[in-house]
């Protein structure tokens, strides 16, 4: 917006003015969604039978004064290894985690393990057109803790399905805090929640294990990954974990060489209760976190992580709210609501009973006499 104003009008808007405008514009964000939940302001659409909840964390570069205490201390104690840039793997310690959440409904899309493997192949077989997420709402917050955002996600889901007639699922990446919060919220709301581990995270572990067995660039690694992925999709994750460990032992790999294999096996065993992909595929559930990954990219990475950016807490929260409204398709409705609230604050609040008097009608003006004279 600032760039558009500058290019079209030749006016430069100061940064602080933009931040203040964003804070004022986003001040009714929570009230807007609270009203929707309490009054069911927006009619719940007839949507697919699967109701998905998903959340993730994404770091935002902050001013040092706005970092959490532990992160600020780590930033102050950090000793840079290089003078002008960070070395590989070195962290800046300047980020504060935001929590990103998404709630949507979707139609079932049943698939087979073989179809998934072929779809993930470099030259993949095109599947039938998959259903798109419906009535998707995404949002992010850096001020509120993860438990508050998970609660908001369940409140949004409850608004859409108050009688719990849909199938509730949660797509996760394996973060233990997130898993604990989801289970607790499901218990509080009395809903049966199916938790599904993101398949792409599983695939990343498989590829790391594959390179422990194969030389770099060896095409046999693709077949190795495909075979084990198919078995995991058939619901045999524990057998895959045991098999790759046994293979590493028979090959006599050292502790360092087999570390990626053990990490993959540990991952599969730790989360095996969320790896029943055979059931998920048969019921047509989504098995990847593409929606929340896209939300993290749009809401946080594309705007908040631009080169040199350092955010204040209030400024970051304001921009996250506005981008969330735009991404969810709620901005126009929110803006009408925000203008109503501004009218109440700036006008109705100043008069008794909120009755703003009508302006006095303008006095009628007499028609001016013509200055032209008839000359005979």
Stretch-by-stretch model annotation:
Residues 1-376:
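Catalytic center-proximal scaffold of phosphoryl-transfer enzymes
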């Amino acid at each position: 917006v600032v760039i558009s104003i500058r290019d079209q009008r030749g006016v430069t808007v100061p940064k602080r003015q933009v931040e203040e405008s964003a804070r004022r514009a986003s001040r009714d964000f929570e009230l807007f969604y609270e009203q929707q939940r309490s009054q069911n302001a927006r009619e719940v659409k007839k949507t697919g039978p699967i109701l998905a909840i998903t959340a993730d964390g994404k770091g935002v570069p902050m001013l040092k004064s706005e970092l959490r205490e532990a992160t600020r201390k780590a930033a102050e104690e950090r000793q840079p290894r290089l003078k002008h840039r960070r070395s590989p793997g070195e962290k800046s310690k300047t980020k504060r985690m935001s929590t990103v959440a998404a709630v949507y409904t979707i139609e079932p899309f049943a698939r087979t393990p073989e179809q998934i493997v072929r779809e993930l192949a470099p030259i993949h077989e095109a599947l039938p057109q998959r259903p798109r997420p419906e009535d998707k709402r995404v949002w992010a917050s850096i001020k509120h803790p993860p438990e508050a955002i998970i609660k908001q996600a369940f409140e949004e889901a409850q608004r859409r399905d108050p009688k719990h007639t849909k199938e509730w699922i949660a797509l996760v990446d394996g973060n233990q805090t997130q898993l604990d919060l989801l289970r607790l919220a499901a218990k509080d709301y009395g809903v049966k929640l199916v938790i599904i581990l993101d398949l792409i995270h599983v695939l990343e572990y498989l590829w790391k294990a594959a390179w422990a067995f194969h030389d770099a660039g060896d095409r046999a690694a693709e077949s190795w990954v495909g075979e084990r992925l198919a078995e995991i999709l058939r619901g045999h994750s524990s057998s895959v974990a045991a098999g790759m460990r046994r293979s590493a032992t028979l090959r006599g790999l050292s502790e360092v060489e087999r570390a990626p294999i053990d990490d993959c096996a540990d991952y599969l065993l730790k989360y095996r209760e969320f790896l029943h992909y055979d059931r998920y595929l048969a019921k047509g559930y989504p098995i990847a976190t593409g929606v929340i990954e896209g939300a993290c990219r749009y809401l946080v990475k594309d705007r908040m992580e631009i080169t040199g950016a350092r955010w204040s807490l209030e400024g970051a929260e304001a921009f996250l709210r506005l981008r969330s409204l735009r991404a969810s398709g709620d901005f126009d409705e929110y803006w009408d609501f925000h203008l109503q609230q501004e009218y109440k604050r700036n006008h109705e609040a100043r008069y008794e009973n909120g009755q703003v008097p009508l302006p006095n009608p303008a006095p009628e003006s007499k028609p001016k006499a013509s200055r032209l004279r008839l000359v005979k």
